[in-house]
Amino acid sequence: MALHGTGSGCYNPSMKDSVQTRALQCLLEASPDGKMHCVEALEKDWKAGRLTLDWPQPMDHVLDAGRPERPVLVSPRDVPRRRLGSVEGQAAMLHAIAHIEFNAINLALDAVCRYRDLPADFHGDWIRVASEEVYHFGLVRQRLRDLGFDYGDFPAHNGLWELARKTAHDPLVRMAMVPRVMEARGLDVTPDIMRKFENIGDEQTVDVLKVILRDEIGHVEAGSRWFHYLCDQRGLDSESTYFSLMEQYLAGHMSCPLHKEARKAAGFSESELNHLEALCAG
């Protein structure tokens, strides 16, 4: 089901909703502003104990998330190259980051409302992550607006959400492939992006990226922690399972260099880092 356009209100405060119902409402909300407000209310009510852990509906039919009509989604190869030599190039880079953060909001919400047979702490972690991704999206969107642009002004691709669809059937696979692969890759590349903005004197964007990098370590760590939890529950060796899934879903492809310090803080072992670097070497 594909959802576009402007969504309706997020919730009825007169009812005690389940966390699944509320997270799903936020997930399907198409308006960026509406989604941000919805997540803020979701986190507030979760912390206040106003949400139940009932699961009133299956999620098998939900294969897409709410998003606005723009940006137009294109193949990754058709996304314009982002060079920082012009204001438009700077905006294009910021737009790409904003799109990642918008997708990350949806990914966290999807984890909250899709995977029911997990401890309350799992849902609390991903509600927190969704809230932090909302904050990141707002920071990057403001930088876009400072340059005279907004989210939706450039084309974008849907690769991150496509991986979410492929991993929807199993939280173990989702934790391995989204936080521990896609988001972990963000830990690797963000320092270089920061240097590029620093080289053109854009300290405001550098400061935004510092916040994102700091918080994303925590997001990847949450993915690592729940991946290990699920492996333990199933009697699986976590490292061999991780690399088996990488081979299955990404043909073992890996890009380097790695931000090893950040990955260690996010729950990667020295053995895993050595294995990842070996994949880079081919």
Q: What would you call each of these model-derived segments?
A:
Residues 1-14:
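N-terminal amphipathic/basic-hydrophobic helices that include classical n-h-c signal peptides
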Residues 11-282:
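Non-heme di-metal
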